[in-house]
């Protein structure tokens, strides 16, 4: 389950890797165009989950709550070997909690450790009630997850695997003035 473009990108790469290990693997859930290109049939458009901030969330609260329940029911209906949620913790961890409550033996994996080391340190302990394993992007994150009972593997950050800027791209951004990113 992915709820935003960055999760779709991570999910597509994960699906490709899993398929290389087991060509018969099947994927069911929620994702965007990249995950769909890897064979996922999305339960509903991932874009429905891409909301941020109180002003955006409030009018969609009941719809999102219904989507959480639908996603958990769909996950249970297909009897997966594992439920893999990707980032979008406000949505994904609620789905995992419902699914785990209904089927305690369900293996749950969350890809992208929440930044408990930077803010909301209690989130890891709360997350450990529903998540068995975490795939961490940063090398210092596993101890935070392991400290509350989850297993955790550092899998690396996808930015590291991307190509460096070409000489022409470097020249383009190497102007005289400061670089302002907004």
Where are the language model's segments positioned?
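Active-site and donor-binding regions of nucleotide-sugar-utilizing enzymes
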Residues: 1-176, 180-182
């Amino acid at each position: 389950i992915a709820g935003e473009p960055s999760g779709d990108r991570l999910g597509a790469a994960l699906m490709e890797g899993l398929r290389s290990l087991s060509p018969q693997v099947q994927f069911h859930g929620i994702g965007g165009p990249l995950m769909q290109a890897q064979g996922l049939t999305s339960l509903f458009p991932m874009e429905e989950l891409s909301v941020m901030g109180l002003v955006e969330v409030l009018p969609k609260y009941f719809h999102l709550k219904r989507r959480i329940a639908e996603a958990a029911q769909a996950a249970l209906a297909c009897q997966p070997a594992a439920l893999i949620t990707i980032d979008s913790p406000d949505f994904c961890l609620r789905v995992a909690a419902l699914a785990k409550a209904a089927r305690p033996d369900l293996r749950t994996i969350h890809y992208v450790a929440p930044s408990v080391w930077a803010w909301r340190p209690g989130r890891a302990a709360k997350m450990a009630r529903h998540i068995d394993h975490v795939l961490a992007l940063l090398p210092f994150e596993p101890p935070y997850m392991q400290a509350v009972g989850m297993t955790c593997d550092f899998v690396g950050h996808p930015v590291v695997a991307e190509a460096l800027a070409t000489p022409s791209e470097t020249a383009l951004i190497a102007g005289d003035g400061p670089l302002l990113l907004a």
